[in-house]
UniProtKB/Swiss-Prot annotation:
HAMAP family: UPF0323. It comes from Helicobacter pylori (strain P12). InterPro entries: UPF0323. This is UPF0323 lipoprotein HPP12_0232. Residues 1-27 form the signal peptide.
Amino acid sequence: MKKPYRKISDYAIVGGLSALVMVSIVGCKSNADDKQKEQSSLSQSVQKGAFVILEEQKDKSYKVVEEYPSSRTHIIVRDLQGNERVLSNEEIQKLIKEEEAKIDNGTSKLIQPNTNNGGSNEGSGFGLGSAILGSAAGAILGSYIGNKLFNNPNYQQNAQRTYKSPQAYQRSQNSFSKSAPSASSMGTASKGQSGFFGSSRPTSSPAISSGTRGFNS
């Protein structure tokens, strides 16, 4: 009776395939870890505070025209005439609660498919609540809503559309990335998500200043 045997070349092929699989796994894990560190770093910088300017559009919707890191969170609303005012904490919390209810019942523009096939930012119809939650300030003030948003693919696209232009969005990303702590000072990075909503949650809500300067709400 002949004993079964394998050629040395067979084992070499199997060994080579195993090595390729291991290299692929390690490479994917490394890329995922780098992405997690980047998003966690961005999330941490956002939690410190954000200065956000929302501008009213002709269709009565609102867009983020400027935002950058700040020691305190401020949300300024600018109307069509150029008048500005700082939203009070009470107003912001009310807007966020109203938007959260829309998210829960599926009517929020943030989680609906983008039907604007023309590619223009005009007419997207984001209200104040949607614009706030799509901005950096939303990641701070509405962090508890994050679990309802950051796994939604429509939100990932719509959050960028809350900005007035691609340039405004890119400026925001760059400014928060520059202020983010380095990976060496962060320790182990937690799992991150795209957009401003990350897995980290601020320990306390940043103070928000309030005031009125001629904007009729």
